[in-house]
Amino acid sequence: AEGCDRGFSRSDELTRHIRIHTGHKPFQCRICMRNFSRSDHLTTHIRTHTGEKPFACDYCGR
């Protein structure tokens, strides 16, 4: 893209970066139909629907 001077050592990183310029969001939540450019963002988002909290504090258990 014009004005973008980013470089990447891996093609998958470039593919992910290009989505910033194109607005392409290929990952869709099946519950609310919201779209995301990255699969890890979709995974985190789905937890808002399921209530899953996979990380607990080692000190207090919360």
UniProtKB/Swiss-Prot annotation:
Keywords, in A-Z order: Activator, DNA-binding, Metal-binding, Nucleus, Repeat, Transcription, Transcription regulation, Zinc, Zinc-finger
Entry keyword Zinc-finger: yes
SMART domains tied to this protein: ZnF_C2H2
Zinc keyword on record: yes
Top-level taxon of origin: Eukaryota
Major location (coarse): nucleus
Subcellular localization, as worded in the UniProt entry: Nucleus
Name of the featured protein: Early growth response protein 2
Organism this protein belongs to: Poecilia reticulata (Guppy)
